[in-house]
Every structure is written in C-alpha cells, then in structure tokens.
Amino acid sequence: MALVLAVGTATPSARADAAPRKETSYYSTRSVLAEFFPGSEHVGFRTFAIDQSIRARLAQRLGYAPARDKYTIFIATTHGKVDGYAVVDDEQGLHQPITFATRLSPRGMVERVEIMVYREPRGDEVRDVRFRKQFQGKTSQDPLRLNRDIDAVSGATVSSASLAVGVRRATILVEELALGLSTLASAPAAAPAGERDAMAARPRAARPASVNR
C-alpha cells in the first residue's frame, strides 16, 4: 500500500474547567490508515470546504451545524477501484475531545471504528471491541441513538454518546461529500495541510439536545 502522510504533532489545549487529563495515544493517522487498508494499493485524501450550502445540508441531516470549516476524507483504492473510505475526527467527551477513526465501505457502511487518542481520566472502556462492533453495518440512515441503537458502556455513558454522535457524522459526511466522486481516486497520498497525528482539540460542536453529557 502506498501511503505517504505529512503530519505534525500538537498537544490539544484543555478547557479551563477540564478535569486532569490522562492522554493515551493508540494510533497515529498513518498507522490507523495502514491498519484499515492493509491490502490497498493507494491511500489518498480529499479535503472538502464546508460552504454555507453544504453546512445547511449537513445541519439538516445531523441535527446540528458542523463546527469545522472543512473535512478531510481518506480513500483507499486498488487499480482505480475504491476499497473504502476513512474519516479521522474529534468528538467532545465529558472534558476533552476524543480522537477516533471510522472506516467505511465503498457504499458508506461502517466497517470499523478505532479510538486513536483518549484524553479523559476515565471512560476508556469505549475502546472495548464489544462496544465498537455495534457500529459495524451502520449507515447514514441509522440514527445511532444511545441505548436504543447503540448500548452505552457502563461507567462511560458520555464517551459512548460522543462516539455515537461522531460515527454518525462520519457516515453522513462520506455520503454527502464523497460517494460517487471519481476524482477522489486520484487524490495524492499525502496528509492534508494542518492535519495532525494527535489531532489538536477543536471547537466544541453543537450537539443534539437529546445527547446527555
């Protein structure tokens, strides 16, 4: 697999009211993509600017306006055929952002979810394979409601809710921005400018009222 990622590192800034941080890194962007697509010939990316029209469309589907002005979607190909997509993103936990990666099929179905960086002092039980496997087979049509579509991990309710919100966003981003775009296949296999392995903390996204922090 040809994979060349130009990435930097950064330490996310904590909120003033945050609890003591216990940051543990499990994957870099490079390593998670290599594990997601071990047999792919090429892994590239495309960064999508979120203009007013796209933001409104995403907000309608998500139930909240996305916080970022652009999103990067990675794509794996072999002989020009799409093997799958990946989204590396952050979702706010109780005090700190959780960095995670979602692998999706060529049709936008969730195949795997991995925690890349966990920064909370507790709640990392969301790394348990039994919790993460609940997302397999889900698509943008699944609401991923906590304790209805996805069972929360005992003692990690907020982190469970955060991952459900983040994975659902990944399915919608891929469907709205990437599916069917042949130009993705020719994107260079290099990390987008400003992408960071440790994924600096990002502005807190508006969240659906039904999600309990």
List the predicted regions and their residue ranges.
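Bacterial N-terminal signal peptides
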Residues: 1-8
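Predominantly cytoplasmic-facing regulatory/coupling regions of multi-pass membrane proteins
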Residues: 9-13
